[in-house]
Design a protein with these regions (language model features):
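Nucleotide-activated chemistry modules centered on ATP-dependent adenylation/adenylyltransferase
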Residues: 8-416
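Basic polycationic patches enriched in arginine
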Residues: 2-4
Length: 416
């Protein structure tokens, strides 16, 4: 009690530096930041940006934690629609997967969180913004780049990074002040949002170690296999099993379904924004299901060169977003191309769900380029004759034929 009273007195006496907006999750690192920044003379206003990863009960707990560790005020922003409209829609339409496996669950949120924190900071008349990222991960880059672009006039304060604070040090600091340590403070760093859940720490640091069985095996009480139907308009899902549902609501519904089946669990190893390798575990069933279904519908309606160039640009888009470069103008150009490419990506996909896996088993579209009335692969067609096919095959062989002749030095006539 004495330590808490001393801390409260210190915060009152040292508020000379003015208001500061702190991106706040209610976790250990940001809980540490509140009293630490108050000791440094800031009036700390916490900002929780809901990107789809919390229940009403969890948001209430975050509010209580902010007050308990000394926040001057606490602000909640519902950014689920913004995350979907600004980021997730292009990750679906672009089929964006990092390393072909991971759907950028965290990168899809961080820039929006920075945007919302800046808006709140300006409304408060804040002189600075702060976040609780360490100096070893991608989030510090994502936050810092966004904050510098959006609000170059505001100071960026990062106590965890600047002081090199470890988790055990943060716990000891809060305990010394008599302040509550978040109940989930432990060996893992967990991020849950609209586009999936990730966790790092423990087994993720050993590339030979695997996750606990409960994070790999399907739930023992998983439902029986079933099929669902997704309706699509211009590359975005608009209905589930005939019921109109779109945006964050549809993603959340698919997330609940896939979680029950244990769908979407995986491990990703990749390059970080800092150039080192990193490893995480993730569960992102809705993201993987939507991207998988969308890709199959695209195969039905896009030409091969549309698909080829979309794939290249989708990978580049995901790479830039992953590394905090959302504001690069080239991404707006890519978004325009992606949007244009989706003009005919309308139809339905039928998806079979089973414990631990899913499969797209059917697609249909009014714009389907697979027309069995004029051609059936491997069987018959009405678009060309056998002689025309023979001539086409002969011409198609020319580049490779010429390369082979050049390689062995022969000059035999191609007509012989």
């Amino acid at each position: 009690m004495r330590a808490r009273l001393k801390f409260a007195y210190l915060c009152i006496m040292q508020s000379s530096r003015g208001p500061l907006a702190l991106a706040f999750s209610g976790g250990l690192d940001t809980s540490y930041c509140v009293p630490r920044l108050a000791e440094d003379g800031w009036a700390v206003h916490t900002v929780y940006v809901d990107t789809g990863g919390s229940t009403p009960e969890e948001r209430a707990a975050i509010r209580r934690q902010a007050g308990a560790v000394g926040a001057a005020s606490h602000h909640e922003i519902d950014a689920r629609d913004l995350v979907y409209d600004r980021f997730v829609r292009f990750l679906i339409q672009g089929n964006v997967l990092r390393g072909e496996v991971y759907p950028l669950s965290v990168a899809a949120e961080r820039t929006q969180q920075a945007l919302s924190v800046v808006e709140t900071a300006r409304a408060l008349g804040a002189r600075a913004v702060a976040h609780g990222s360490t100096g070893a991960g991608n989030d510090q880059i994502r936050f810092d780049v966004a904050l510098r672009v959006l609000a170059p006039e505001l100071e960026i304060v990062t106590p965890i990074r600047d002081l090199g604070i470890k988790r055990e040090q943060a716990i000891a600091y809060l305990e010394r002040l008599g302040l509550p340590v978040p109940a989930k403070a432990g060996a893992y760093s967990i991020n849950r949002g609209l586009w999936g859940t990730t966790w790092g720490g423990g087994w993720t640091h050993d590339t030979w170690a695997g996750p606990p069985a409960e994070l790999v095996d399907p739930p023992a009480d998983a439902p029986a296999s079933r099929e669902i139907v997704l309706a699509w308009e211009r590359g975005l899902p608009v209905a589930l099993d005939g019921a109109a549902l779109a945006g964050p609501g549809l993603v959340a519904a698919l997330g609940d379904l896939s979680e029950a089946y244990g769908i979407g669990r995986g491990i990703h190893v990749g390059e970080t924004a800092l150039g080192i390798k990193g490893r995480i575990g993730f569960e992102a069933g809705a993201a993987l299901l939507l991207i998988g279904a969308h890709r199959e519908l695209e195969k039905l309606v896009l030409t091969k060169w549309q698909t080829f160039w979309k794939d290249q640009l989708g990978r580049f888009y995901g790479d830039r977003l992953h590394e905090g470069q959302y504001f690069d103008p080239s991404l707006r150009d890519i978004e325009a191309l992606i949007t244009s490419s989706q003009a005919r990506v309308t139809g339905e996909t039928r998806v079979r769900l089973a414990p631990g896996r899913f499969q797209v088993v059917g697609t249909r579209s009014p714009h389907s380029m697979m027309d069995t009335s004029v051609a059936t692969y491997g069987e018959e067609n009405r678009l060309w004759t056998g002689d025309e096919a023979r001539a086409f095959a002969r011409v198609a062989a020319v580049p490779s034929l010429l390369a082979a002749r050049a390689a062995d030095g022969t000059r035999k006539s191609s007509s012989s």
